Amino acid sequence: MLRKLAIAAGVIGAMAISGGAQAQNGFRLCNLSSINLEVAKALNTGNKDPAGRPIIISEGWYQFAKGECAVLWSGKLQYRYYLLYGQAKEANKEWKGDIPICVSRQPFTITSDLCPPDKYRRMFFQVDTGENDGWTQNLRD
């Protein structure tokens, strides 16, 4: 019996140290790369505008020093899929995917699928958080 308790305690301790993908409520991002980076986030709300286009909310830029973690969406996760794009301009490196989302060179919040002429698109990657209340996404070299 004591051996089973010791094993269970060891497993629980290992899970706490590893910072598992579902450690706390909210969506947390950690920069585990060796360089500073900036991140844009986006969310397809599932709603449509009056013209029938999807309402996608994108925001940026969030600055992350190497080793830094921060919450991008707080509280219990309301959606299954979240979109991210990361870049380190000085290192000419990107964390990207295949979903085009509108961004701006300056800090921004865009609430449309349309991309005005003074904005541009970057290729975001999708994070599937499953049915979890919280998620930690790590960006690595």
Where are the model-predicted features located?
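Intrinsically disordered, low-complexity segments enriched in small/polar residues
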Residues: 20-66, 71-77, 85-141
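Bacterial N-terminal signal peptides that target proteins for export
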Residues: 1-9
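Bacterial N-terminal signal peptides
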Residues: 8-16
